[in-house]
């Protein structure tokens, strides 16, 4: 993905910002209304979701999946790089928050009463955890925003004249993955249909 020619050219950092903006705006429309910490977490979780890839020189997700067992080794390397490069620069609570955002970045999770990470079933944050004290984060929403951002990157590249077969195929696949997606009251089709 990172090596497919696109106009405008997007970097990993630019992509992360687009995902964060989408995540923030979509968080505002979640039902029931999300607590303030959930909106905060969705913004920063999306903003930092590819941070490990920045540190490991952008080994993109499809490549990781294709590597099978090596995916675990790459995840360990990403974790190691975050520890080596970020831990010395950040206060401990900030570092722990970055880990919360970047480890299993597409998992919907909370911090329980003992501040242990708890992954939630069905990627849904029940009402009883929609409070700041549980630090909820919508991993499914971030993953969806990641795909919307990729879809938009293909769309804008194609309308700007770079319409390689890979981009056209990627746009079609992403559209098909997103067209029936609904997130806590948000119909994703209404967004992507604007860019068909």
Each model region followed by its residue ranges:
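Alpha-helical, largely C-terminal catalytic domains
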Residues: 1-196
């Amino acid at each position: 993905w990172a090596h497919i020619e696109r106009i405008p050219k997007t970097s990993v950092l630019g992509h992360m910002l687009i995902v964060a903006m989408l995540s923030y705006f979509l968080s505002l429309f979640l039902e029931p209304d999300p607590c303030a910490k959930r909106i905060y977490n969705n913004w920063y979780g999306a903003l930092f979701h590819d941070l490990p890839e920045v540190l490991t020189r952008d080994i993109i997700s499809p490549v990781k999946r294709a590597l099978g067992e090596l995916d675990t080794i790459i995840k360990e390397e990403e974790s190691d790089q975050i520890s080596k490069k970020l831990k010395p620069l950040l206060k401990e609570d900030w570092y722990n928050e970055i880990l919360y955002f970047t480890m299993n970045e597409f998992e919907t999770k909370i911090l329980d009463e003992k501040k242990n990470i708890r992954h939630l079933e069905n990627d849904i944050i029940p009402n009883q955890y929609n409070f700041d004290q549980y630090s909820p984060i919508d991993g499914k929403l971030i993953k969806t925003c990641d795909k919307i951002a990729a879809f938009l990157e293909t769309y804008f590249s194609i309308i700007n004249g770079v319409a390689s077969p890979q981009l056209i195929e990627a746009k079609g696949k992403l559209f098909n993955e997103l067209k029936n997606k609904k997130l806590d009251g948000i119909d994703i089709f209404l967004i992507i249909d604007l860019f068909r």
